[in-house]
Amino acid sequence: LNKSELRKLQEFLRVSFGAPAIKVGLDPKNEDAAVATYGERVLGPIIVDDEDGDRSFSFAMKIPVERPVLQEYLRRMFENDDLTVIARARKTDSVELNRGDDFLAVISADDPKGKTYTLQMAILDIDLEEL
């Protein structure tokens, strides 16, 4: 990861979540990864995938709440009421996170009882080109 990619990933996450305080820096434990933070909170890792000649990134964030409060938790955390959690067709173990009409990520249950979730966001190199 170079400085330009880190800056673009940071801007992409800031725009996506509507949270200008998100920061992205190199992961001190893994030189091939970055880590996203929001204030003092570590949001999660950003992993590089450059298989097949296409460079993409995967952002994962653990969410320590149950399904009924997912939307409110994310809205409060990012101070953005435009974030909405929407059920997926024929899927009961995951939901979608949108900002307005824009799809952001899939949020999947970590266990069958849905006590905790993981947000998974794919970021393609094409997503970063305009930043």
Predicted regions mapped to residue ranges:
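Terminal leader/tail segments of proteins
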Residues: 1-131
